[in-house]
Amino acid sequence: MNPESVFPRATGSADASVRPAFPDDAAEIARIQVVTWRTAYGDALPAAVLDEWDTDAATASWRTAIIAPPTPGHGVVVALERNDVVGFAAFGPAELTAAEQPDPAGPTAELVALLVEPRWGRRGHGSRLLAAVSDLVRSGGAARLQVWLLESDRVSAGFYESAGWAPDGWARTLDTGGEPLREIRWHALLDDPDAAPQEGTQ
């Protein structure tokens, strides 16, 4: 997959753009991740998850994901406001559940993370990230894109719904060492014109 071949569609304006992540972005990605978790999900995530956050380990993990992705279908992209990294998205091939059959329409990709630092929200960065990931996985042969959302996360659900996504009927419960977290899976068909992100929704 050649990321540069699909990025012109999703670059946005001169002040706001999306590009492939570079190794030097890893520390900023880790910082945005924990800031966003604490701000947006502090009430949902167990305190231990945030209290035990290891910035150095997270930075190293993101650097590895950028430099040596586990498959050609994995990738990380970042959203820029001028030259500042303000958000990121990570994606890869989806793993089927034990009771699930492959989609006859073609392979499914999974959006592992899409986070925009809260102070940069409502400027279209989330929409541009989603458009870039959709283009990248579509160019890699995926017919469908999915994401797992916390059942209580109505803000993210509203964002994906406005982009033409919908729950696909699957749910799972995560054991985080505290209260169980229930997640709902959302999806979009990549050839569906209604699944195009709307500019400025996040």
For every predicted segment, state its role.
Residues 3-11, 20-23, 34-44, 50-121, ...:
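Acetyl-CoA-dependent GNAT
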Residues 15-17:
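Extreme N-terminal starter segment of soluble prokaryotic enzymes
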Residues 22-25, 153:
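Acidic/polar helix N-cap motif
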Residues 28, 128-129, 155:
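Charged catalytic carboxylate motif
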Residues 29, 33:
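Hydrophobic pocket/interface hotspot
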Residues 105-109, 146, 150-202:
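C-terminal "cap" of GNAT-fold acetyltransferases
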Residues 125, 142, 165:
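Short phosphate-binding/catalytic loops that engage adenosine nucleotides
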Residues 137-149:
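Conserved GNAT acetyl-CoA-binding A-motif
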